[in-house]
From Swiss-Prot:
It comes from Cupriavidus metallidurans (strain ATCC 43123 / DSM 2839 / NBRC 102507 / CH34) (Ralstonia metallidurans). This is Large ribosomal subunit protein bL12. CDD domains: Ribosomal_L7_L12. SUPFAM superfamilies: ClpS-like (SSF54736), Ribosomal protein L7/12, oligomerisation (N-terminal) domain (SSF48300). Homodimer. Part of the ribosomal stalk of the 50S ribosomal subunit. Forms a multimeric L10(L12)X complex, where L10 forms an elongated spine to which 2 to 4 L12 dimers bind in a sequential fashion. Binds GTP-bound translation factors. GO terms for molecular function: mRNA binding; structural constituent of ribosome. The lineage of its organism: Bacteria, Pseudomonadati, Pseudomonadota, Betaproteobacteria, Burkholderiales. One of its GO terms (biological process) is translation.
Length: 124
Protein backbone atom coordinates (compact mmCIF):
# COMPACT_ATOMS: atom_id res chain seq x y z
CA UNK A 1 0.00 0.00 0.00
CA UNK A 2 1.36 3.43 -1.03
CA UNK A 3 1.48 6.36 1.36
CA UNK A 4 -0.96 9.08 0.32
CA UNK A 5 -0.64 12.81 0.68
CA UNK A 6 -3.32 12.74 3.39
CA UNK A 7 -1.30 10.17 5.37
CA UNK A 8 1.75 12.45 5.24
CA UNK A 9 -0.29 15.48 6.31
CA UNK A 10 -1.75 13.57 9.26
CA UNK A 11 1.70 12.41 10.35
CA UNK A 12 3.15 15.93 10.08
CA UNK A 13 0.15 17.37 11.93
CA UNK A 14 0.78 15.03 14.86
CA UNK A 15 4.46 16.03 15.22
CA UNK A 16 5.85 18.33 17.90
CA UNK A 17 7.80 21.46 17.04
CA UNK A 18 11.10 19.69 17.73
CA UNK A 19 10.13 16.79 15.47
CA UNK A 20 9.12 19.21 12.71
CA UNK A 21 12.44 21.00 13.04
CA UNK A 22 14.26 17.67 12.65
CA UNK A 23 12.07 16.83 9.63
CA UNK A 24 12.93 20.14 7.96
CA UNK A 25 16.65 19.54 8.56
CA UNK A 26 16.32 16.05 7.08
CA UNK A 27 14.62 17.50 3.96
CA UNK A 28 17.38 20.09 3.62
CA UNK A 29 20.11 17.44 3.80
CA UNK A 30 18.35 14.88 1.61
CA UNK A 31 17.34 17.24 -1.21
CA UNK A 32 20.03 19.94 -0.90
CA UNK A 33 17.54 22.77 -0.35
CA UNK A 34 17.12 25.44 2.29
CA UNK A 35 13.81 26.15 4.02
CA UNK A 36 14.95 29.71 4.79
CA UNK A 37 15.44 30.49 1.10
CA UNK A 38 11.97 29.15 0.37
CA UNK A 39 10.40 31.35 3.02
CA UNK A 40 12.20 34.44 1.71
CA UNK A 41 11.24 33.64 -1.87
CA UNK A 42 7.60 33.17 -0.91
CA UNK A 43 7.35 36.41 1.06
CA UNK A 44 7.53 38.88 -1.89
CA UNK A 45 4.70 37.08 -3.65
CA UNK A 46 2.52 37.26 -0.58
CA UNK A 47 3.00 41.01 -0.10
CA UNK A 48 3.17 41.87 -3.78
CA UNK A 49 -0.43 43.02 -4.00
CA UNK A 50 -0.08 45.45 -1.10
CA UNK A 51 3.21 46.82 -2.44
CA UNK A 52 1.70 47.34 -5.88
CA UNK A 53 -1.16 49.38 -4.42
CA UNK A 54 1.07 51.68 -2.38
CA UNK A 55 2.78 54.23 -4.59
CA UNK A 56 6.36 55.04 -3.65
CA UNK A 57 7.39 57.56 -6.31
CA UNK A 58 5.62 60.85 -6.87
CA UNK A 59 5.82 63.72 -9.34
CA UNK A 60 5.34 67.31 -8.15
CA UNK A 61 3.68 69.31 -10.92
CA UNK A 62 3.39 73.09 -10.94
CA UNK A 63 -0.18 73.55 -12.22
CA UNK A 64 -0.59 77.34 -11.94
CA UNK A 65 1.80 80.08 -10.89
CA UNK A 66 -0.68 82.38 -9.16
CA UNK A 67 -0.14 86.07 -8.47
CA UNK A 68 3.27 85.82 -6.71
CA UNK A 69 5.46 84.75 -9.64
CA UNK A 70 8.70 85.91 -7.99
CA UNK A 71 7.95 83.90 -4.84
CA UNK A 72 7.18 80.81 -6.91
CA UNK A 73 10.45 81.19 -8.83
CA UNK A 74 12.34 81.41 -5.52
CA UNK A 75 10.54 78.30 -4.24
CA UNK A 76 11.35 76.40 -7.47
CA UNK A 77 15.02 77.38 -7.15
CA UNK A 78 15.09 76.21 -3.53
CA UNK A 79 13.41 72.88 -4.34
CA UNK A 80 15.30 72.03 -7.53
CA UNK A 81 18.61 73.84 -7.18
CA UNK A 82 18.12 75.38 -10.63
CA UNK A 83 19.58 78.71 -11.63
CA UNK A 84 17.44 81.84 -11.92
CA UNK A 85 16.87 81.57 -15.69
CA UNK A 86 16.06 77.84 -15.58
CA UNK A 87 13.64 78.31 -12.68
CA UNK A 88 11.95 81.25 -14.45
CA UNK A 89 11.59 79.20 -17.65
CA UNK A 90 10.06 76.33 -15.67
CA UNK A 91 7.58 78.67 -13.95
CA UNK A 92 6.71 80.42 -17.24
CA UNK A 93 6.02 77.04 -18.86
CA UNK A 94 3.50 75.87 -16.22
CA UNK A 95 1.98 73.32 -16.01
CA UNK A 96 5.30 71.50 -15.73
CA UNK A 97 6.85 68.92 -13.41
CA UNK A 98 9.09 70.44 -10.75
CA UNK A 99 10.31 67.16 -9.20
CA UNK A 100 9.87 63.66 -10.61
CA UNK A 101 10.26 60.24 -9.01
CA UNK A 102 10.62 61.50 -5.43
CA UNK A 103 9.37 59.92 -2.21
CA UNK A 104 6.17 61.06 -0.50
CA UNK A 105 7.89 63.21 2.14
CA UNK A 106 9.93 65.11 -0.47
CA UNK A 107 6.84 65.57 -2.66
CA UNK A 108 4.78 66.88 0.27
CA UNK A 109 7.57 69.25 1.31
CA UNK A 110 7.90 70.64 -2.24
CA UNK A 111 4.12 71.02 -2.53
CA UNK A 112 3.96 72.96 0.74
CA UNK A 113 6.76 75.34 -0.29
CA UNK A 114 5.17 76.03 -3.67
CA UNK A 115 1.69 76.51 -2.21
CA UNK A 116 3.08 78.85 0.45
CA UNK A 117 4.53 80.91 -2.43
CA UNK A 118 1.06 81.11 -4.03
CA UNK A 119 1.23 78.37 -6.68
CA UNK A 120 -1.26 75.60 -7.35
CA UNK A 121 0.44 72.20 -7.24
CA UNK A 122 -0.53 68.63 -8.13
CA UNK A 123 1.22 65.58 -6.71
CA UNK A 124 0.79 62.48 -8.84
Amino acid sequence: MAITKDDILEAVGAMSVMELNDLVKAFEEKFGVSAAAMAVAAAPGAGGAAAAEEKTEFNVILAEVGSNKVGVIKAVREITGLGLKEAKDLVDGAPKPVKEGVDKATADDAKKKLEDAGAKVDVK
